[in-house]
Amino acid sequence: MKKRTRKKLRALWGLLLVPVVLTGCRIRTTPMGVFAQILEYAGQNNSQASSSHGHGTYHTESQPSSTPIPQMDYDSLDAIGEVQTIMVYLVGSDLESDYGNASLDLDEMETAGVDTAHNNILVYAGGASEWQDRGLSSDECTVLLLTDTGFVPVDTYPAENMGDPLTLSSFLNYGFDFFPADSYSLILWDHGGGPVLGYGVDENFRDLLTLDELSEALEDSVGAHMTKLEWIGFDACLMSSLEVASVLAPYANYMIASQETEPGWGWNYDFLSELSDEVIPGDVMGEYIVDSYMDYGEYVFNIYPNLYSDLTLSCVDLSAYAEAEEALNDYFAELDTSLDVQNYPRLVRNRARVRDFGTYSSDMNYGMVDVLHLLELVGNDSEAAQAATEAVENCIVYSDTNMDNAGGISICYPYQTDTDYRDACIEMLYYLDFAPNYTRFLEDFYAIENGDTLLADREISNAETSVTTQNDGAYDESDITLQLTPEQQANFASGGYYILCKARDEGYITAEEDERADDMYLFIQGSTRVTLDENGFLHAAYKNNAVYMQDQDGLSDIPMILTETDISDTENRYLAHAVLMNYTDNWESQTVKVQIVVSDEYPDGIIRSAIPLDHDDAELQSASKQLIHLDDYETMSLVARCSYVTRDDNGNLLNFFDWEKSGWMMGIDVDLTGDYHTVVQPLDHPENYVCIFFMKDSQGNTSYSEMIPLK
């Protein structure tokens, strides 16, 4: 009996409950995380102006925008630049109140060496419950102007809802009227939730800007001045999409945005040093912004490998957007014509393989997929697909990424998301009048998904299985197989497997401690790395090894609990849920998702990053822009839930996470104050481990195999 481990984890049972108590109702998430809160709040406070009136609800209400009356004598300012005015809409949110990221970016702007004699950097700051620096108040919104000595407050107003389109349009009109220049641009700073949810989370008013509200704000300002912004940039997550481009196209020449979530530090504002006495075209400035963002990210990763983050940033030519939308509209008309119950499963299998975004830092499925990768996998090389690919590529004037299959711009294609989110996407597409044939295709796709059952017998509990073990020179690798019926093969969408440990056989529990010890299992690893061969065999290639933690006290005596998150030929990515704790000064804890990568470069694995998770409600999905530095904490606790084998009324195994909880949890404490690292090594007793396959059919139904011993 491994008493040291078990005793630690009996104590951890209580600690896991602490973060919920400590976090209270703080919003520390991107828009999806707070969306349910926003809706609840808006429903109870209808007096709030211009908040979203339902889940993804789009409306056409409009209020005339006016320019705020200046509160200071502009003659007291030094000469105002007349070349470029860059307006920064800085919604501080929890990124400022909890982490001070907005203040840090203001510092970056000050130290960039901006030519303020010819250029205006104008900031509208608000939307945070607390400002960590700069003497700003959460009760106010402040206009800041960058001078050669730093930012100076120009005007101050009572706190305004930065999720109200009127607030944004008023700020833009303010910039046009009082800081005239040859060229104007806009940076939208904060969280982003993609086209369905929108941009910006005002902590004080619990509101954000949906795409219809963003369009309204731009029409009442940029449109009213009958001009165009040179570029609009999102220093925010998930906003490089065709749907967002459709909103910006009438009002700007270029869009600069990220397909993926951004790390908390966001853009590197050193690019402002490029400003001079001549107007810089948007495509050129876009290249500066993309390069500085990527260069700074790589710089951080080299110093702090465990702050690694996937990075994407693109500059999109909005003048080429209309042609891309038209080409996509033609392609999806063709695809929709061929969509029926026979080829639907093949389409689902390809959709499941498309690069998606936002999944690592969130439990939420945003449905954001790379357009070019989608066309590559689904397009079948038709002329319409090739024309759409070429048109989309023409939109992307410059992009960079450290990810595979991130081409520069996304589209929202929800798959296996909740119905509310899917319906909100459809409603958004209708409001934007975006590629009507694409909207029709999605509706037909979902009609089949929710229609009559395509697979009569989806159970795989009685399927033939086998395990073949061979040594690859380093480890014993098991090829675990499961035979599907012809009907199951035809309707196969995706699959995966779980590796479970027999708690009693591995020595974690005894019959004296729990009379049901023989039925108790620990979840060790989950993966979707399976292949279906031409003979209908589903294969899971599992190297009979596991990832352990090593600290100054030695090697952990149970493996880390991992879920594989990204299928790649070059590396294996896993997530582990953990609790970080400090004891010495102010006692604090932080729940996180830790990313571990195993590759040829890191055969023993490396901790790449940690994302905070603060859930007050299990139904709230959170995606964080912030990365956690493990060295700021003293202890990391990793746990595994122990559950009893549970079956349905027909005797089939349920999903492990629906098994009856035993009340026991096993795991380890890792000392972060000294040296710590991951170690990959073979399982001591693979005969104490089992594999369970799961299979999803084309309509999203899931079934589970019986437990398959590894040896």
Report residues per predicted region.
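Bacterial N-terminal signal peptides that target proteins for export
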Residues: 3-13
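Bacterial N-terminal signal peptides
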Residues: 14-22
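N-terminal extension/subdomain marker
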Residues: 34, 39-180
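Terminal, contiguous helix-loop blocks that mediate binding/assembly
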Residues: 47-79, 195, 199-234, 239-711
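Structural recognition of the beta-strand scaffold that forms the well-ordered cores
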Residues: 85-90, 120-125, 184-188, 230-234, ...
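Residue-level signal for short, function-critical loop segments
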Residues: 92-93, 127, 190-192, 415-417
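Catalytic-core segments of thiol-dependent peptidases
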Residues: 125-226, 236-237, 242-243, 259-260
